[in-house]
């Protein structure tokens, strides 16, 4: 791992100036180790880059990107909101001190328990289907309150021919439609017709998520343009919201871009100012048809691996070395962790 926070001191690795050997001796292994300074610096980079392009900007790291409570607690102190999926992540966000009003509850099959808890806390609920919209409305009415909600959209990028870095033989435009998350485009008319009957929900904005399919700024510009086009058709449902939210999701490559689940890691990762400029320019253009001035919209992003990947590591101890010298030579290092944590399943031989 190459990082300004990772150094070699007297033949041993140190993170943020702290010896990893000493950390292993004190706390044992396996262990996730993060640099607080690296996280602070990366949050500041995101906020500075996007905040200079958009007056109302919120950083919404998902808990799934790093479900370590201590890391999340630091992000809370750094004024980050939180995107959660399921009751476990909601509980994790609360334990990490995230204000409920800064939590968005995602997921395509939320049960009544988590919906009721989210409404009671005052967290936002991201609606994934007309059925779920009716369910949230019914529960909120039973609780004699109004639920703040967003609609998760599945923008069309039919003209984009770029393929995914996860699966280079498949088009991003097809993969973003293939995933189950989000309201099917064929059901948007249904939810629009239903909305006037829902008197216990308040629509505050729209949510989408592409994922780490591409570092190409042109793909990102096409993505946010498609989001804007889709949300404008549903904008009348917003009612009297003063500063509606557009959450474009995430999928930002980390600077090192060393994640092994990405097949195509070629090319330079754009800087965050380059990402921000390209994305915000296209979003401003896309929102030109809105009844709101573009600057009235709150822009949210979910930085994911772009925030976490270069700020820490997984520390493990080599317990044994084995060598095979008969036939094809092999060497194994047996460590006290699991491939589940190292994400090594199916890694080709040429991977570092």
Question: Can you say where each PLM-predicted feature lies in the sequence?
Answer:
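Structured alpha-helical segments in the cores of large, soluble enzyme domains
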Residues: 42, 106, 184-202, 227-241, ...
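Glycine-rich tight-turn/loop motif centered on a GG-T
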Residues: 28-31, 101, 120-124, 164-183, ...
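Alpha-helix-loop-beta-strand connector modules within alpha/beta enzyme cores
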Residues: 146, 227-233, 275-287
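A charged N-terminal "starter" segment
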Residues: 1-148, 170, 197-198, 202, ...
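Non-cysteine beta-strand/loop elements that form the S-adenosyl-L-methionine
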Residues: 85-88, 106-110, 146-171, 201-208, ...
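Charged (often Lys/Glu-rich) extended helix/loop segments that serve as interaction or gating elements
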Residues: 278-352
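Glycine-rich beta-strand-to-loop/alpha-helix junction loops that act as flexible
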Residues: 210-211, 246-255, 301-305
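Short acidic, glycine/serine/threonine-rich loops at helix termini
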Residues: 72, 95, 115-119, 136-139, ...
């Amino acid at each position: 791992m190459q990082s300004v926070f990772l150094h070699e001191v007297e033949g041993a690795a140190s993170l943020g100036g702290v010896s990893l050997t000493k950390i292993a001796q004190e706390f044992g292994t396996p262990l996730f180790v993060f640099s607080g300074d690296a996280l602070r610096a990366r949050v500041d980079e995101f906020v500075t880059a996007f905040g200079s392009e958009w007056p109302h900007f919120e950083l919404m790291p998902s808990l799934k990107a790093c479900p370590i409570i201590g890391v999340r607690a630091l992000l809370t102190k750094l004024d980050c909101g939180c995107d959660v999926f399921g009751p476990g992540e909601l509980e994790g966000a609360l334990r990490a001190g995230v204000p409920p009003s800064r939590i968005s509850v995602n997921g395509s099959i939320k049960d009544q328990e988590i919906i009721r808890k989210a409404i009671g806390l005052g967290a936002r609920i991201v609606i994934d289907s007309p059925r779920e919209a009716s369910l949230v409305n019914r529960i909120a009415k039973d609780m004699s309150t109004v639920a703040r909600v967003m609609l998760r959209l599945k923008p069309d990028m039919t003209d984009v021919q770029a393929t995914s870095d996860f699966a280079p033989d498949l088009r991003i435009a097809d993969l973003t439609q293939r995933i189950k998350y989000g309201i099917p485009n064929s059901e948007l008319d249904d939810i629009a017709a239903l909305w006037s009957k829902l008197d216990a929900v308040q629509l505050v904005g729209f949510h989408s998520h592409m994922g780490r399919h591409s570092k190409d700024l042109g793909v990102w510009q096409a993505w946010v343009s498609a989001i804007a086009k889709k949300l404008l058709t549903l904008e009348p449902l917003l009612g009297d919201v003063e500063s509606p939210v557009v959450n474009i999701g995430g999928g930002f490559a980390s600077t090192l871009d060393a994640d092994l689940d990405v097949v195509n890691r070629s090319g330079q990762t754009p800087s965050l100012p380059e990402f921000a400029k390209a994305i915000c320019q296209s979003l401003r253009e896309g929102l030109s048809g809105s009844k709101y001035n573009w600057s009235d919209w709150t822009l949210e992003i979910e930085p994911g691996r772009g925030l976490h990947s270069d700020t820490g590591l997984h520390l493990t101890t080599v317990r044994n070395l084995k060598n095979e010298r008969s036939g094809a030579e092999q060497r194994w290092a047996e460590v006290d962790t699991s491939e589940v944590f190292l994400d090594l399943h199916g890694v080709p031989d040429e991977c570092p």
